[in-house]
Amino acid sequence: AMINRPMSTGDALYLDRAALAELDIGAATVRIDERTSLRILELDDQRAQIELTAGTINLSVRNVYEGQYYEIDTPTLAFVVEQPGIYRVDISPSGDSTMISVVDGSGIVYGQDNASYSVSNGRSYRFNDTSLTDYQVFSLPERDEFDQWCLERAQRYDESESRRYVSEDVIGYSDLDEYGTWGSASSYGSIWYPSGVAVGWAPYRNGRWAWIDP
């Protein structure tokens, strides 16, 4: 996949060894570990539903607005976010169990025959079947390299100067720090100035347009 390519309903993504990726979804960010396979089942202004078939993701939800819905489906369960927070979802190498780690926040796990289980912050939950009857509850494990990368990426967002000028729900707002600076004009207000721009530059002359179905 190309950097900054919009992803939409029906798109699939596989990360090979040593690869990492980040998806911005409105008020949430999905960070993806190596050897992970996922598909976007539904994505619009109200609903984000992702099918995780292998590997590990970190879901960081900054806000859950009225009517919004974040769901992660795995081979054994469906996890739905209830509150803003940080959630990690791991699928076992065999694919027959799913671990939900709730760093912060809360959610509901759904299984077969309307089974459900509430999960809350500070715990990891491993579900070994689709009925949610075979499960274990643990303390959160020590951070690994993927957790550390997710933390560093989150800090980059939190410390972004552009948060002072742009809503954090604007996808890619933190990139403005890297590619320009902020100033102000008495007749307009805050203005972002791109850096490294050649003389005579004008918008829309470079690059290309593409239509991505929602």
Please tell me what each predicted stretch does.
Residues 1-109, 113-123, 153, 159-161:
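Flexible, surface-exposed loop/linker segments and immediately adjacent secondary-structure boundaries
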Residues 65-67, 113-214:
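Low-complexity segments
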